[in-house]
């Protein structure tokens, strides 16, 4: 049984700790996006959804209590199940591949798949970092911080500070151009945020709408980037300016069987032609896509030259440049509207967010094949190949 993506939406991406979503629960964001999916799909009732699959990289605290099920109950009702999926930065794309696989296996007809993450509310390491001492003794590289893995990748693959800063500038410039052109407008669900606080013993409140990605710095320059100090290693090349931003956001797509799609008289947007994951040395985790991309191409029976557009998650500029170099990617096809350095990286949401973005840009450019790929903390990579339909 074939599976198709019918539609997809996302929130704008907020700056963690200082942006519009800094006090907003991630399940609140997810509910708004999912309800938009359902409301904009003629004939689809909430009870017709077989499962809600929610990617989340730190499912604890405000993202605990099995956030996938919690979101399903709130968005669609108690009769719709939900689960939480965690493959760190790949979680949002992983949920889409699970939904597709379940439909292809005949296990269901309709899935909501994506992810949600609040990096404002949950720290990067979670609330209790408690690694097994055997990890430190036997596989110490697994515990190396993400910034230091980017430094390791840069050193191994010869990526310079100058190249990293130039790549970061490109990300901001392209993202600013995309926002100015309104490219993200139709895919973003505007979120009304209400804030309440006490000031001078008086209750204060305000409401505002978040409908634009907040991380883009339109005044970024090479001179400004060059002044930033290394963030993780003395003499290193990774700075706050050439690393992805910590972010808040949610994104989901509707995945449906051909049978249900025809029953409802719907048209598909795309199909997932392949999705592969791979393991790499945790010390060089950023190179993960180089291992995953060939596996995905082999699954799809395709050559790299057939891919017309690529969304490569910019965990770090050094990491992205190393992937482009080692995987033989055409830089002009990569992140045509900017990437995570400018637009943000809300961990468990990112894979779905990039899927929504690339499908819309492929439609504008009338392209057939696109790829979403990302490195994954702990030493993994993921790559998904999408075929645009209609």
Model-derived regions, located:
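Conserved catalytic cysteine-centered active-site region
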Residues: 24, 56-109, 140-151, 219-245, ...
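Active-site-proximal alpha-helical scaffold in enzymes
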Residues: 87-116, 154-184, 252-259, 324, ...
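Conserved beta-ketoacyl condensing-enzyme motif
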Residues: 22-133, 188-210, 283-284, 304-326
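Condensing-enzyme catalytic core mediating Claisen C-C bond formation in acyl metabolism
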Residues: 1-26, 221-287, 291, 298, ...
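Conserved N-terminal phosphate-binding loop of PLP-dependent enzymes in the Aspartate aminotransferase
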Residues: 117, 123-124, 128-129, 147-152, ...
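Short, well-ordered amphipathic alpha-helical segments that serve as non-catalytic structural scaffolds
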Residues: 26-42, 67-71, 95, 146-153, ...
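N-terminal extracellular/periplasmic Venus flytrap/periplasmic-binding protein-like
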Residues: 10-12, 23-32, 43, 166-263, ...
């Amino acid at each position: 049984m074939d599976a198709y993506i019918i539609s997809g939406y996302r929130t704008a991406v907020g700056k963690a700790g200082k942006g519009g979503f800094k006090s907003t629960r991630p399940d609140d964001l997810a509910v708004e996006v999912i309800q938009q999916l359902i409301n904009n799909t003629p004939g689809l009732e909430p009870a017709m959804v077989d499962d809600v699959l929610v990617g989340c990289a730190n499912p604890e605290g405000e993202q605990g209590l099995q956030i996938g099920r919690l979101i399903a109950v709130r968005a669609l009702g108690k009769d719709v199940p939900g689960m939480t999926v965690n493959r760190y930065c790949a979680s949002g794309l992983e949920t889409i591949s699970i939904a597709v696989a379940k439909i292809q296996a005949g296990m269901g007809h309709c899935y909501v798949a994506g992810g949600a993450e609040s990096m404002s509310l949950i720290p990067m390491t979670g609330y209790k970092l408690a690694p097994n001492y055997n990890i430190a003794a036997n596989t110490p590289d697994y515990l190396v911080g993400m910034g230091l893995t980017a430094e390791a990748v840069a050193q191994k693959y010869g990526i310079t500070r100058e190249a990293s800063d130039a790549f970061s500038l490109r990300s901001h410039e392209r993202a600013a151009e995309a926002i100015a052109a309104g490219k993200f407008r139709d895919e973003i669900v505007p979120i009304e945020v209400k804030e309440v606080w006490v000031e001078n013993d008086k209750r204060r409140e305000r409401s505002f709408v978040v409908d634009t990605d907040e991380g883009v710095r339109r005044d970024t320059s090479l001179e400004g980037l060059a002044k930033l100090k290394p963030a993780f290693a003395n003499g290193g090349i990774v700075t706050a300016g050439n690393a992805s931003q910590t972010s808040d956001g949610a994104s989901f797509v509707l995945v449906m069987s051909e049978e249900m799609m025809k029953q409802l008289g719907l048209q598909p947007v795309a199909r997932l032609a392949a999705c592969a994951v791979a393991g790499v040395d945790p010390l060089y985790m950023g190179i993960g896509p180089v291992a995953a991309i060939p596996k995905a191409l082999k699954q799809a029976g395709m050559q790299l030259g057939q891919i017309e557009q690529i969304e490569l998650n910019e965990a770090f500029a050094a990491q992205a440049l190393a992937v482009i170099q080692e995987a033989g990617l055409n830089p002009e096809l990569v992140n045509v509207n900017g990437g995570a350095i400018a637009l943000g990286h809300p961990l468990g949401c990112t894979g779905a967010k990039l899927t929504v973005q690339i499908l819309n840009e492929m439609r504008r450019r009338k392209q057939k094949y696109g790829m979403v790929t990302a490195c994954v903390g702990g030493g993994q990579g993921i790559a998904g190949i999408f075929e645009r339909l209609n």
